Amino acid sequence: MDSKTIAKIAQIASALEVSGYPKPGNVHRTRDFEDMEFEDFIISGIVIGDTIEKATSKVNKNCLQNARLGKYILDAVKETDKWIANNTNLGIVMMITPIACGAAISDDFSQLRKNTSQLMEATTVEDAVDLYDAINIADAGGMGDQDEYDVAS
């Protein structure tokens, strides 16, 4: 599957995820929060498209450790942060980036799980550092404080 198609699927998936109803305790199409609205999530889903397209166009099944999943997660969060003040898509970006890259190197759907797993296993220390930066930029809540390896420190 080509990178443009994969990016559009990622955008559509993001928009549909927030459109589900009901989503107890979460923003959805009939319930906003004081600091987040349904439209913030739609915008967030749209603005990740270019980053997902770039990530999927660069991934190479013969050199998985160079996939840079963490970099593209960070790039997507930075792009979202330009448009939206709150964390509206860190979770979906963390999930969809490796799946999208797995799709890019799969000849058919039956290879997606294996290829995505191999991409995840090939992540590097740099990916982890970029992921920590993405979590901090997104200002993700609910992480709790840790004595050691606290994501906020």
Predicted regions and their residues:
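Phosphate-rich cofactor/ligand-interacting catalytic cores and adjacent structured alpha/beta frameworks
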Residues: 1-67, 104-153
